[in-house]
Amino acid sequence: MVQAGEYLTIVGGCNDCHTENWTASEGKVDPSDRMAGMKTGFRGSWGTVYGKNLRIIVQRMSEDRWVKVLSTADSGDGRPPMPWWNTAKMNERDLRAMYRYVKSLGPKANGIPRGLPAGKEPAGPYISLTPVEPKANP
């Protein structure tokens, strides 16, 4: 089940936001660094959020709670760009496999910044998710 969970986190795009340098390295990140969160923020109209360190979260979250959170976005912090609408469509077995994979990695501290409200400038790097309208041609 752990192997299935690893596979699902890869094809589900979880590493894109929850693993530092995943996208820049085209997925060539040491497995010991996966799912420890990202220090690069995602900024939009809601403010700036950071991919959470799932390895720390699963240490204090039960498997049943994980399934509920990913099935219903009942985390109290379901802000974009987390695609709750996708994880809510996953079956329970797959969600449990993902939990077991992340849990198998063990805890790893990574110093992820706290999210910021709209209008507050982040101190570190971020990816802008604000749509930009093209300029009209004269």
Protein language model features and the residues they cover:
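A bilobed periplasmic-binding-protein/Venus flytrap-type ligand-binding module shared by bacterial periplasmic
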Residues: 55-56
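Sec-exported extracytoplasmic/periplasmic mature domains
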Residues: 7-13, 19, 59, 71-75, ...
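Solvent-exposed, polar/charged alpha-helical surfaces in well-ordered, non-transmembrane soluble domains
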Residues: 3-7, 15, 52, 64, ...
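Electrostatic cytochrome c docking/interface patches
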Residues: 1-10, 24-26, 138
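Flexible coil segments in periplasmic/lumen-exposed cytochrome c-class electron-transfer proteins
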Residues: 19-49, 64, 79-138
